[in-house]
Amino acid sequence: MTVVNAMPTYKDIAYASASPTQKLDLYLPEGDGPFPVVVDVHGGFMMGDKSNPAGTDELLANGYAVASVDYRLSGEAKAPAQIQDIKAAVRFLRANAGEYKLDPERFAAFGQSAGGNLVALLGTSCGVEALEGAVLGNADQSSCVQAVVDWFGPTDFLQMDQQFAGTSCPANHDDASSPESQLVGAPIQTVPDKVQFVNPITYVSAKAPPFLIQHGTADCNVPPQQSQLLYDALVSAIGADNVTLTLLEGASHGGAQFSDAANMQLVLDFLASNLK
């Protein structure tokens, strides 16, 4: 995991009031703005927090504001509360863009693992009312984003154990105690409709923004085929020029191959080309 050296410019901003969890930290680069925004979503579903957003030092050095968002974990609320929180955070930031020197027209989302699922869902479900959570505030604002960086996020939970078949990786996502089952409130294979409700592929359309998807070939937490499924669906909808899938040979569920300078440059180049 990359250690963030920067300190938040604003810490624990409440973006909604339904839960004390609904807070974000905002990191601003030097200058007067308005700054393009990268909304960082942590992994975990069941655990984790906003304290260590990925690539923040590099993003700040390149002129991006970073909003690191906490969301209700599955022990507090079941899906779709998590994506509704992320959308509420985006709407809050747009509504208060002037105060925080943000550019409301240039928003990207960046997430790892469970956060990858949530940013992919954020990207594909623009305008989907059932996932919006408008009651959380700023309903007049858009929650759409202009680019998505998805690091090893799961997509179709129902296929994960099948995709691990024949490998040395544990196939335990169908278990009642798995993060995915805890997210939807039941063993995933017993509630396929709930699972598809939070599958970003469900909402892929020609309206989807450009995506950079990265996954390690040796990931034993989320099968790399999960990213391939999303990539294939996006290519069909928005064209191969707007979607990049990078499979990092030998990389596991995160690690140095994602956060090293060469790979972070790929992320920065992608953001620069899509947040002009």
Where do the protein language model's features map onto the residues?
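Mobile cap/lid helix-loop segments that gate and shape the active-site cleft of serine hydrolases
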Residues: 2, 159-203
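Conserved alpha/beta-hydrolase "acid-adjacent" motif
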Residues: 220-229
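Short substrate-entry loop that stabilizes the transition state in hydrolases
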Residues: 33-35, 41-78, 129-131, 158, ...
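Alpha/beta-hydrolase active-site loop
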Residues: 77-98
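Primarily recognizes the serine-hydrolase "nucleophile elbow" in alpha/beta-hydrolase
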Residues: 91-165
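Catalytic histidine-centered segment of alpha/beta-hydrolase-like enzymes
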Residues: 251-261
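N-terminal cap/lid segment of alpha/beta-hydrolase-fold proteins
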Residues: 1-32
